[in-house]
């Protein structure tokens, strides 16, 4: 892959990811080879960066973009072609690409769940239809997204997506079982208070803390919660427990700046859509950290205070 132009920072990271992923240039040995997998991955990430539909992205963003020459495209893909690319890469491949952007050194993590609109609909017209319409509109479906975040660098380490009302503990168990980073601390809110979750977390290298839920009013005040790890969380909470709010900040930034809603109708495609969004989010974090390392400036301000005697006459002599 020879690039005859100076790369921008996003393109540089895309090249690094593709070379590290060990994906072949083409999945097929014979047949049509108009597009390479590097071009497919790059265009899908650019699609998620735009936040537009497939047709709008092709007509407004890609048609007159420099990325056509940067990626070496022989022709602009059509909407149906781009849709086929979204189905081409499985969740296993997307997670493999995602793991390439995870930092190697992680000390403190946090987990939290949030809801994302999975059916884009105007709230204003929804309210007007309910006021004047004879029939109520069907309820809005929300995709429950749980994010496992590196607190220090704000990278997303893992995620899970469900369309049902599943408890936070069950989702966290799946995320912790997939964890491969050892000797780290984890933080969660009261929704993750479970002795079984503490055991799973420690079995997978996570020293997890979650505040204990409020007990029954009829219980004694000095009654201790059941479970060894739950008692530890109540009696010896860590000093950095307030850092859990950073995962809420990551959720807010992700929903306000990148994922307004999930456009896909099928759940399998929603998972892939969210996966590509999170890949682009971590790419932005990588680019942001490299920028901060390259442009680190320190200013030393010295302030000297000089004291001059006041030669004005005293008020008594006036």
Task: For the regions a language model picked out, list residue spans one by one.
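Helix-centered, glycine/charged polyanion-binding patches within enzymatic domains
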Residues: 190-257
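Non-catalytic DNA-binding core/recognition domains of DNA-processing enzymes
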Residues: 36-39, 61-63, 78
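DNA-recognition alpha helix
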Residues: 54-71
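A short glycine/serine-rich beta->alpha loop
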Residues: 27-33, 70-71, 134, 264-266
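Polybasic low-complexity intrinsically disordered regions
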Residues: 32-33, 46-49, 59, 84, ...
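Basic, short loop/linker segments at the boundary and entry of helix-turn-helix/winged-helix-like folds
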Residues: 3-49
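Major-groove recognition helix of helix-turn-helix-like DNA-binding domains
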Residues: 69-89
């Amino acid at each position: 892959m020879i690039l005859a132009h100076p790369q921008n920072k996003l393109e540089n990271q895309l090249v690094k990811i593709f070379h590290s992923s060990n994906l072949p240039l083409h999945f097929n040995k014979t047949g049509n080879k108009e597009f390479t997998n590097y071009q497919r991955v790059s265009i899908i990430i650019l699609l998620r960066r735009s936040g537009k539909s497939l047709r709008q992205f092709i007509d407004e963003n890609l048609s007159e973009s420099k990325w056509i020459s940067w990626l070496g495209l022989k022709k602009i893909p059509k909407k149906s072609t781009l849709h086929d690319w979204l189905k081409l890469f499985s969740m296993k491949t997307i997670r493999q690409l995602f793991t390439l952007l995870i930092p190697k050194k992680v000390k403190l993590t946090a987990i939290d769940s949030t809801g994302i609109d999975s059916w884009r609909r105007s709230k204003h017209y929804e309210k007007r239809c309910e006021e004047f319409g004879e029939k109520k509109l069907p309820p809005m479906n929300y995709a429950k997204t749980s994010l496992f975040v590196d607190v220090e660098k704000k990278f997303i380490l893992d995620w899970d997506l469900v369309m049902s009302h599943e408890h936070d503990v069950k989702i966290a168990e799946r995320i912790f079982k997939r964890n491969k980073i050892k000797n780290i601390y984890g933080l969660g809110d009261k929704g993750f208070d479970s002795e079984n979750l503490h055991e799973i977390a420690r079995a997978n290298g996570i020293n997890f803390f979650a505040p204990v839920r409020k007990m029954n009013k009829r219980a004694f005040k000095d009654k201790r919660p059941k479970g060894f790890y739950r008692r530890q969380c109540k009696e010896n909470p860590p000093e950095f427990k307030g850092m859990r709010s950073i995962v809420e900040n990551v959720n807010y930034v992700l929903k306000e700046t990148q994922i307004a809603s999930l456009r896909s109708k099928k759940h399998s495609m929603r998972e892939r859509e969210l996966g590509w969004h999170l890949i682009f989010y971590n790419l932005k974090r990588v680019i942001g950290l490299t920028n901060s390392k390259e442009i680190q400036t320190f200013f030393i301000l010295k302030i000297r205070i000089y004291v001059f005697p006041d030669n004005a006459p005293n008020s008594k002599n006036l």
